[in-house]
Swiss-Prot record:
One of its GO terms (molecular function) is sodium channel inhibitor activity. Coiled coil: none annotated. Signal peptide: none annotated. Keywords: Amidation, Disulfide bond, Ion channel impairing toxin, Neurotoxin, Secreted, Toxin, Voltage-gated sodium channel impairing toxin. This is Toxin Tco-gamma. The keyword Disulfide bond applies. Expressed by the venom gland. The modification Cysteine amide is found at C61. Gene3D superfamilies: Knottin, scorpion toxin-like. Pfam families: Toxin_3. Has the structural arrangement of an alpha-helix connected to antiparallel beta-sheets by disulfide bonds (CS-alpha/beta).
Amino acid sequence: KEGYAMDHEGCKLSCFIRPSGYCGRECGYKKGSSGYCAWPACYCYGLPNWVKVWERATNRCGKK
């Protein structure tokens, strides 16, 4: 599957001020095949189905 990588708070993983290759590495840590900075957040490809990705309908970023 593909989608925006999330941090531990459910927010999109920001790549705004990250070095080149950051998103590819982060997506790899999540078992994805590749990823890139879709400014300003990391977008991943080839993720296993069990990995949670950001979705507008279930967005919990900044909410308690």
